[in-house]
A protein has these predicted regions:
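Long, acidic (Asp/Glu-rich), low-complexity accessory segments flanking structured domains
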Residues: 2-198, 211-250, 312-314, 403-481
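A generic structural motif
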Residues: 258, 284-299, 399-400, 446, ...
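Chitinase-like catalytic core of GlcNAc-active glycosidases
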Residues: 151-355
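Surface-exposed substrate-engagement region within the catalytic domains
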Residues: 291-434
Length: 481
């Protein structure tokens, strides 16, 4: 059932006016067989991917609408307007081309979008400065409009005094598990490098020390629980770190939070892992940020921010003036809907035991509840002195991932198939209600993001930094007066 009327939500800092809509009948004849699409479907079979959506035909510029209507529907920043425009005239398969105006510029989008690329609105004005992205929810006839960000370097739009925990950040769960592997082990559709290019700024990494007793060895195998992440042989953290550093060198405005946890078979300890990271990775002068306080963007740009889910050597507790080493995420509550790490710097939702498919709705509710908690924050700008000060301004880390290794319907990609679209829908239609808050999403940690080029979830998360940026501009203007 499709909602009766069209709804527009403006999640940008710019007033937007709908000026015209054009309606088009759905294509009458099926598309020609696409050999590329068939190949892609075959690839899904051999890489454990089960979600597949047929592409929608594009409306060409010379296609004539069967109906059009000139309107003047104004939508203020961060407001929603439920219009009197009907969702469809003859069939709920109809297409719509929308024409918007903002600051004298005209922009166009068609819905449903034919490809992921056309989620970006098409500027119709010469030398247009504004860029918009639209995410359409067909069942609700709802169009959410975001300011388009260059996902490759979206943090450069934010000022140095922005606290990292105040940001809306896309993340991935078991980030490097994109290789051919058992379906209960694989969690990602694309490589870490591709994730970084598309806005992901939080990696969840699990490692196994291969030679824990040899101080000269730095090998850390990438694992998921007790399993290697690839059937073709061990993959190593050193190679992943090189990719991250290369990305940061080319995008110095960005930072990456890495949550690191020890897993895998063998006799090794957290303390041994902490020594390996200190001696071989996070050395003085390296790109690692190991201060135990939550940094501002200015402190973290170009760096890897360590969030450690492991205990450390006693000598590391004396670093940074006796304040410790790395943002402390030890004491991470298991399988929780809402819990705070003992350090006070991280509040988590990490309910993962979805034993039956009907429990997926419970997981979705936990995700949206944690989003709401994050949305009600309003953190200060500027550098905070230490871990105790940052307790009042924690990270909200929200895992969309869950699985049951022993049940086909609850393998990671099956969970993501339902949780990811539900989260996009929630963000676009419902997230952000409290006045005076920043509407942050916190860090949303996902499985299978970017499948078939679908980055709507990352776009929506990054887009929710707009309200924070507006508050920052207002504060700067007030300080100048």
């Amino acid at each position: 059932m499709v909602a009766e009327h069209l709804t527009i939500r403006n999640l940008t800092s710019t007033p937007i006016t709908l000026k015209r809509i054009e309606r088009f009948h759905a294509p009458e004849k099926p598309r020609d067989v696409d050999i590329g699409a068939l190949a892609k479907n075959f690839t899904r079979l051999v890489t454990n991917v089960t979600r597949a959506e047929a592409p929608v035909a594009s409306i060409t510029d010379d296609t004539k609408p069967f109906q059009h209507k000139d309107v003047d529907i104004h939508v203020e920043p961060f407001k929603t307007v439920r219009t009197e425009l009907r969702s469809y005239i003859d069939s709920d398969k109809e297409r719509i081309r929308w024409f918007f105006e903002s600051k004298g510029e005209r922009h166009q989008i068609q819905t449903p979008v034919p490809t992921t690329e056309t989620a970006s609105m098409k500027p119709l004005s010469k030398d247009a400065k504004l860029r918009f992205t639209g995410i359409f929810t067909p069942a609700e006839s709802h169009l959410a409009i975001f300011s388009s960000a260059n996902l490759n370097a979206w943090m450069r739009e934010l000022k140095d005094d922005t606290l990292l925990s105040s940001l809306s950040i896309p993340g991935t769960h078991n980030s490097p598990t994109c290789h051919v592997a058992p379906p209960s082990v694989r969690c990602q559709a694309v490589s870490p490098r591709e994730q970084l290019k598309n806005g992901v700024r939080f990696f969840d990494i699990r490692v196994q020390p291969k030679f824990p007793n040899d101080k000269d060895k730095d090998e850390l195998a990438l694992v998921h629980s007790t399993f290697p992440i690839s059937l073709t042989g061990d993959k190593y953290f050193r190679d992943l770190e090189r990719e991250v550093i290369d990305f940061l060198e080319h995008n110095p405005s960005e930072t990456l939070i890495i949550s690191l946890k020890r897993e895998g078979p063998g006799t090794h300890t957290d303390e041994q892992l902490s020594r390996i990271i200190r001696d071989h990775y996070a050395r003085p002068g390296s790109r690692w940020y190991t201060d135990p306080k939550i940094p501002t963007l200015g402190e973290a740009r170009g760096k890897i921010v360590l969030v450690r889910r492991f205990n450390i050597l006693e000598e590391l507790k004396e670093i940074h003036g006796g304040r410790g080493w790395g943002i402390n995420a030890t004491g991470w509550a298991d399988n929780c809907a809402n819990a705070t790490c003992p350090s006070g710097q991280i509040i988590i939702q990490d309910f993962y035991e979805v034993m039956e498919t009907q429990n997926i709705n419970k997981k979705i509710q936990y995700v949206t509840n944690h989003c709401k908690r994050a949305s009600e924050t309003c953190y200060p700008f500027g550098i905070l002195p230490g871990p105790k000060a940052t307790k009042a301004h924690p990270f909200y880390i929200n895992f969309l991932s869950a699985s049951n290794f022993f049940k086909l319907g609850t393998w990671p990609e099956k969970i993501a198939e339902k949780v990811n679209p539900a989260t996009v829908d929630y963000l676009c239609r419902k997230h952000g209600e409290k006045e005076g808050a920043d509407w942050s999403t916190g860090i949303l940690v996902t499985d299978w993001v970017g499948l078939d080029g679908d980055w709507d979830l990352a776009r929506a998360i990054v887009g929710f930094n707009a309200k924070l940026m507006v508050r920052q501009v207002k504060q700067d203007n007030n300080e100048r007066k």
